[in-house]
């Protein structure tokens, strides 16, 4: 192996559920990456790689499809002891795999990789009876912090005085099941009001230029997600997250579920003046596991093998 392609995982900070209606979502790429390279005897493809092969054959051609058929993907960094963390591993793997195939035939370009991966990932999800926003594919393609709305990607700069950290609930959430459960309650006034509040909070986070404004937006987003769960009668916010939120309030910090909620990764935001050890103590005290994660500015990339 002389090179490999890689793509980052993601955490959706705000805009969950509402993004499916065209509201903005704020998503950060994180430094757990899926890696892909070409091998002579690849393992059986996942449903996402099978969809990617079909899309690449259709849109790029037989040579690139043949390269993709030789791709092996390692996404173990996006899991913990075999349990998915909710970092968008299928999207990162799809982006990395297509990146590897296109690089192998001299056609690598992030915008092309991203477009093909978005189509492939959506087709694979549709076969499962699910529908995603595409935000995780966008984060894996472009890296950094982005505003994702209706398929459009805009870089955002989070306030430098805002410190982000992450924790794992210990519970694996099934995004498709949660989204279907919430979707089944659309039309209830309280559900629609919560979705509008999520959209407003996400837009406010995108425009925040100070840590105070960002924390206010994230707190509002967390409350709106809890309201959505109550209105839809779906368990979106685990009790441990409610406990952590209460413990962080005296520190001026905020915790909220990410993505579909129900488990997976929790985001914690605090002013940089707050001691990281105080945040870590609160995380552990609430029964959550601190995660070593940081925003990854790199999107899909080709790297020479060491």
Where are these regions (language model features)?
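C-terminal nucleotide
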Residues: 1-8, 12-14, 18-20, 27, ...
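A short catalytic or substrate-binding loop motif that flags glycine-/basic-rich loops and adjacent residues
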Residues: 28-30, 260-261
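DPxDG-like acidic metal-binding loop motif
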Residues: 30, 84-110
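Short glycine/threonine-rich catalytic loop with a Thr-x-Gly-x-Asp
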Residues: 87-89, 255-262
């Amino acid at each position: 192996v002389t090179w490999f392609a890689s793509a980052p995982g993601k955490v959706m900070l705000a805009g969950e559920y509402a993004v499916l209606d065209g509201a903005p979502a704020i998503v950060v790429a994180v430094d757990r990456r899926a890696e892909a390279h070409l091998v002579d005897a690849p393992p059986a493809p996942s449903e996402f790689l099978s969809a990617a092969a079909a899309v690449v054959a259709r849109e790029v051609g037989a040579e690139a499809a043949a390269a993709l058929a030789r791709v092996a993907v390692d996404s173990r960094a996006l899991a913990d002891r075999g349990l998915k963390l909710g970092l968008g591993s299928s999207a990162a793997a799809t982006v990395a795999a297509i990146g590897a195939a296109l690089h192998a035939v001299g056609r690598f370009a992030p915008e092309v990789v991203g477009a093909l991966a978005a189509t492939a990932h959506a087709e694979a999800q549709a076969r499962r009876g699910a529908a995603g926003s595409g935000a995780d594919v966008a984060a894996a393609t472009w890296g950094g912090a982005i505003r994702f709305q209706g398929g459009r990607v805009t870089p955002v700069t989070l306030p430098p005085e805002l410190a982000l950290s992450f924790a794992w609930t210990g519970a694996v959430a099934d995004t498709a099941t949660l989204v279907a459960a919430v979707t089944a309650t659309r039309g209830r006034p309280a559900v629609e009001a919560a979705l509008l509040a999520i959209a407003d909070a996400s837009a406010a986070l995108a425009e925040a230029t100070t840590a105070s404004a960002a924390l206010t937006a994230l707190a509002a987003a967390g409350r709106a997600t809890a309201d959505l769960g109550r209105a839809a009668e779906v368990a979106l916010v685990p009790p441990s997250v409610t406990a952590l939120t209460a413990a962080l309030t005296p520190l001026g910090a905020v915790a909220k579920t990410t993505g579909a909620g129900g488990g997976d990764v929790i985001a914690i935001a605090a002013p940089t003046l707050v001691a990281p050890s105080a945040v870590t103590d609160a995380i552990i005290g609430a029964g959550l596991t601190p995660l070593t994660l940081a925003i990854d500015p790199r999107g899909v990339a080709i790297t020479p093998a060491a």
